[in-house]
């Protein structure tokens, strides 16, 4: 009897582990390109660190960070591509994609640095549950290409400097397609629906600024070498279903 009970408990324990194993077996995306000499790494939810190379898996919960002269592109399973500049960091908070499903979702958080992303099929699926956090605001994405810059909270000479962010809507890859982002926080929200325009959140207690024409030279300069790869290279454009 005791032997049977032990076997049952062992089988139950194995069954409980199966979902975790299944999740680990299917990464959210992979590293499509890395440039620069310093390291790029991922911190998993259990705190473990691993060096990133072209082809490395990116999993839900990973915090991806770059060194002082490193840039990279992450290609996700739904066709989304994220380009990250030097000394930058973002977290894959949630990723769930299955072709034809209505509950697809993709949530990320940019912690610091510069970025550019091209949304994929999650942003075009029925639920359109794609959200990008930039510390001081959240971007609701509706099939688009965006660049931005995030400054993390810091302390200088004993004075706290709030986090801040700037985001700009870019021309969509598919000509003639409607594109927009909703930028919101607890103090207000704006809709940016014209390429070349954007908004700024100057601190942690302010609403997004009025939409205006913007160009982030810092982002353009840093990611210039990656721009062609985001649009072409080894990262194919996502196709509409």
Can you describe what each PLM-predicted range is?
Residues 44-61, 65-71:
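N-terminal post-signal-peptidase region of extra-cytosolic proteins
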Residues 25-43:
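Short N-terminal segments immediately surrounding and downstream of signal-peptide cleavage
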Residues 64, 68-73, 81-132, 137, ...:
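Short, small-residue-rich packing micro-motifs
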Residues 36-39, 69-72, 144-146:
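Generic short beta-strand segments
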Residues 41-43, 75, 184:
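A generic structural motif
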């Amino acid at each position: 009897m005791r032997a049977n009970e032990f076997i049952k408990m062992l089988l139950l324990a194995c069954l409980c582990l199966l979902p975790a194993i299944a999740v680990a077996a299917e990464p959210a995306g992979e590293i499509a390109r890395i440039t620069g000499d310093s390291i790029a790494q991922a911190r998993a939810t259990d705190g473990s660190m691993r060096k990133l190379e072209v082809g490395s898996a990116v999993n839900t919960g990973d915090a991806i960070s770059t060194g002082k002269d490193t840039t990279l592109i992450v290609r996700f399973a739904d066709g989304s591509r994220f380009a990250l500049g030097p000394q930058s960091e973002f977290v894959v908070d949630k990723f769930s994609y299955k072709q034809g499903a209505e509950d697809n979702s993709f949530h990320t958080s940019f912690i610091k640095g510069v970025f550019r992303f091209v949304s994929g099929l999650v942003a075009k699926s029925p639920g359109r549950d794609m959200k990008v956090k930039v510390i001081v605001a959240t971007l609701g994405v509706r099939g688009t290409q965006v660049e931005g810059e995030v400054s993390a909270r810091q302390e200088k000479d004993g004075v706290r400097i709030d986090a801040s962010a700037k985001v700009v809507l870019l021309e969509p890859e598919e000509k003639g397609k409607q594109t927009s982002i909703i930028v919101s926080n607890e103090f207000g929200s704006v809709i940016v629906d014209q390429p070349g325009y954007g908004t700024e959140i100057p601190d942690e207690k302010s609403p997004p600024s009025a939409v205006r024409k913007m160009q982030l030279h810092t982002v353009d300069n840093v990611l210039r070498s990656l721009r062609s790869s985001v649009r072409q290279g080894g990262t194919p454009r996502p196709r509409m279903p």
